């Protein structure tokens, strides 16, 4: 099964609380980043996945593309740019 079809299937199966409104998948760790490391190692995920811990919380957000500010870019190969009037955005 191609990666896109597999990802769509997973998105349909997982309940919505696992995802946050900004488009990244919320991942629960143990406060030291180990939970996010285990998430990245599962299912041979690519090394390009970026994760962002949330301070002292056990939760963080992982993107399958690139994280830009609080959001995930919609495809690979994008750059994160900052516009003074709009904030962070992806340039693809």
Curated annotation (Swiss-Prot):
- Which keywords describe this protein according to UniProt? Acetylcholine receptor inhibiting toxin, Disulfide bond, Ion channel impairing toxin, Neurotoxin, Postsynaptic neurotoxin, Secreted, Signal, Toxin
Q: Where in the cell is it found?
A: Secreted
Its PTM note reads: The homodimer contains 10 disulfide bonds.
* Cystine crosslinks: 63-72, 68-80, 73-90, 78-92
User: Which Gene Ontology cellular component terms are annotated?
Assistant: extracellular region; host cell postsynaptic membrane
User: Which residues form the pro-region?
Assistant: 25-45
Q: Which residues cross the membrane?
A: none
Q: Which residues form the signal peptide?
A: 1-24
Q: Which family does it belong to?
A: Belongs to the conotoxin D superfamily.
Q: Tell me the domain comment.
A: The cysteine framework is XX (C-CC-C-CC-C-C-C-C).
Write out the function statement from the record: Alpha-conotoxins act on postsynaptic membranes, they bind to the nicotinic acetylcholine receptors (nAChR) and thus inhibit them. Through its two C-terminal domains, this homodimeric protein would bind to two nAChR allosteric sites, located outside the nAChR C-loop of the principal binding face and at the adjacent binding interface in a clockwise direction.
Give the multimer and partner information.
Homodimer; disulfide-linked.
| Protein name as it appears in the record | Alpha-conotoxin FrXXA 2
Organism field: Conus fergusoni (Ferguson's cone)
- Taxonomically, what lineage is the organism? Eukaryota, Metazoa, Spiralia, Lophotrochozoa, Mollusca
């Amino acid at each position: 099964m191609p990666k896109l079809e597999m990802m769509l299937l997973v998105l349909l199966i997982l309940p919505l609380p696992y995802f946050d409104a900004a488009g990244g998948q919320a991942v629960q760790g143990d406060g030291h980043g180990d939970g996010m490391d285990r998430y990245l190692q599962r299912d041979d995920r690519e090394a390009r996945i970026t994760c962002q811990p949330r301070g002292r919380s056990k939760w963080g957000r992982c993107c399958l593309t690139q994280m830009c500010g609080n959001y995930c870019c919609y495809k690979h190969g994008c750059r994160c740019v900052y516009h003074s009037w709009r904030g962070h955005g992806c340039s693809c």
